Amino acid sequence: MVTSVKGLAYPKHVTEDAETLARALNDAFGVHLFLDYGGTLVQSGAASRERPAPHVRRKLERLCRSDAFFVYVISSKSVHDLRELIGVPGLGLIGQGGLEIWEDGGELEHPVDIRHVDR
């Protein structure tokens, strides 16, 4: 069975699961939400400087204002590029495939495997 939501057709189990998830998240607190930039916030294979659509930015802003969520965007792009492209207050960024981590208002971190640190 297929259900139509906002003009898009989804198998019924997808919309039922989404509704169940939405109900669970209504009562959630401290949820860490990780979103991929390419293919999630912008189309996969999109131009390297493409910004998320205005409705996507508004949803990110709303999530970041909520006390229930910690929202991060993950990308192979640098944190610097992500900050310029997205620019949503309160959004955490993970760039270079995890080599850079930045939380709004914090310092840029470069995690290093302890095995590679001179002792």
What does each of the following model-derived ranges do?
Residues 1-37, 41-42, 48:
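Non-catalytic pre-domain segments flanking phosphatase-related domains
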Residues 42-44, 102-103:
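A short acidic, helix-capping loop that chelates divalent metal ions and anchors anionic groups
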Residues 51-119:
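Active-site phosphate-binding/coordination module
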